[in-house]
């Protein structure tokens, strides 16, 4: 293929010819063969002159079939193609090139070779002889010599031959009948032996099969029982686990519920306490605010022009009452209101 072909990477080992193994004399095989009388360079087996060198392997890198290169090497360069119609074409080309005789000679040789060595159908004809010169009964040539003695001799010979032939045929028939009887007897015995053997084998096979089936049934039964036991134990374990899980869940739910109830009770209690505290506080604020209102009205009536110093209230709500008083004083004072609303006189 050249450069256009696929690249084939070849990797060879450190010892592709395996020379390390063949040169190593310390191995068991080498020592054993040397004890038996073998020496390096000799063949192994009956014939000592066998192959003593290593086999060389040719790596196949193309897609051609086995033996393609050998066929190409042995092919004659001047061999003509075997396509249909090429012979006539070659003759025409030879005539045009002025080599008609040479081409015709090659073509004729090729045709003769095909006829002689080609795989063609051959018809065999049975040879016959002249009926007038051959005696079929005697299987010999007929002699036409004249004479009475010869005729008598011939007749006697013919009669003797016929008698012998009859006797031979009778003997053959007797032998054949005896042989047939013997063969029939042997065949019968063989048949009986064969039938007995087959019956015995069938019986043994049947017994083996029954034993095997019994064994398989027993094993299946044992497996089934084991499986059922295992399933029962698994079911029991699963049920116990489920019951434990349910109990645990119920317990956890109960604990959660109790915790929730406690928490709700606590929250309710805290809310109630807060509400009570708030109510008490609001009540005290109202009382203090009422007292502050009364005092402020008194101070305004007594002296409207100057600011009156409030008397301190000896109570825990004195700070709030003071703030309320200041707020009320600013609201009641006209000058302060003008400053708040930015009204000029």
Swiss-Prot record:
An annotated Gene Ontology molecular function: enzyme activator activity
Entry function: Involved in rRNA-processing at A0, A1 and A2 sites and negatively regulates telomerase.
Region Disordered, residue ranges: 1-25, 166-317
One of the GO BP terms on file: box C/D sno(s)RNA 3'-end processing
Sequence ranges of Polar residues compositional bias: 289-312
Biased composition (Basic residues): 187-227, 238-278
Cell compartments where the protein resides: Nucleus, Nucleolus
Keywords tagged on the record: Nucleus, Ribosome biogenesis, rRNA processing
UniProt feature, compositional bias: Basic and acidic residues: 228-237, 279-288
GO CC annotation: nucleolus; nucleoplasm; nucleosome; small-subunit processome
Keyword Nucleus in annotation: yes
Domain G-patch: 25-71
Family that this chain belongs to: Belongs to the PINX1 family.
Main localization (coarse): nucleus
Domain of life: Eukaryota
Alphabetized Pfam families for the sequence: G-patch
Protein name: Protein PXR1
Stored PANTHER family: G PATCH DOMAIN CONTAINING PROTEIN, PROTEIN PXR1
Gene name in the database record: PXR1
PROSITE patterns the record matches: G_PATCH
């Amino acid at each position: 293929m050249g450069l256009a072909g696929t690249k084939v990477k070849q990797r060879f080992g450190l010892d592709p010819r395996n020379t390390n193994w063949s040169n190593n004399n310390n191995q068991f095989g080498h020592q054993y063969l040397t004890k038996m009388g073998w020496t390096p360079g000799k063949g192994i087996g009956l014939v000592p002159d066998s192959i003593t060198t290593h086999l060389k392997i040719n790596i196949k890198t193309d897609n051609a079939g086995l033996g393609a290169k050998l066929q190409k090497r042995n092919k004659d360069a001047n061999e003509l193609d075997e396509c249909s119609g090429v012979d006539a074409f070659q003759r025409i080309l030879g005539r045009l090139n002025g080599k008609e005789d040479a081409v015709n000679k090659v073509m004729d040789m090729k045709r003769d070779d095909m006829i002689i060595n080609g795989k063609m159908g051959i018809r065999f004809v049975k040879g016959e002889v002249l009926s007038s010169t051959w005696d079929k009964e005697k299987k010999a040539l007929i002699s036409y010599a004249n004479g009475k003695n010869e005729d008598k001799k011939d007749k006697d010979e013919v009669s003797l031959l016929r008698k012998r032939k009859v006797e031979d045929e009778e003997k053959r028939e007797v032998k054949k009948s005896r042989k047939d009887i013997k063969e029939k007897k042997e065949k019968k015995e063989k048949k009986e032996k064969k039938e007995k053997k087959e019956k015995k084998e069938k019986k043994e096979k049947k017994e083996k099969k029954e034993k095997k089936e019994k064994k398989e049934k027993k094993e299946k039964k044992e497996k089934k029982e084991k499986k059922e036991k295992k399933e029962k134990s698994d079911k029991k374990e699963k049920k116990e686990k489920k019951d434990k899980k349910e109990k645990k869940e119920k317990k956890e739910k109960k604990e959660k519920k109790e915790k929730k109830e406690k928490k709700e009770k606590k929250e309710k209690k805290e809310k109630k306490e807060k509400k009570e505290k708030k109510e008490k506080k609001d009540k005290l604020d109202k009382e203090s605010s009422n007292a502050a209102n009364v005092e402020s009205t008194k101070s305004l009536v007594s002296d409207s022009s100057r600011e009156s110093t409030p008397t301190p209230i000896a109570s825990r709500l004195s700070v709030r009452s003071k703030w309320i008083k200041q707020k009320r004083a600013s609201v009641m004072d006209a000058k302060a209101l003008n400053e708040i609303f930015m009204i000029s006189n």
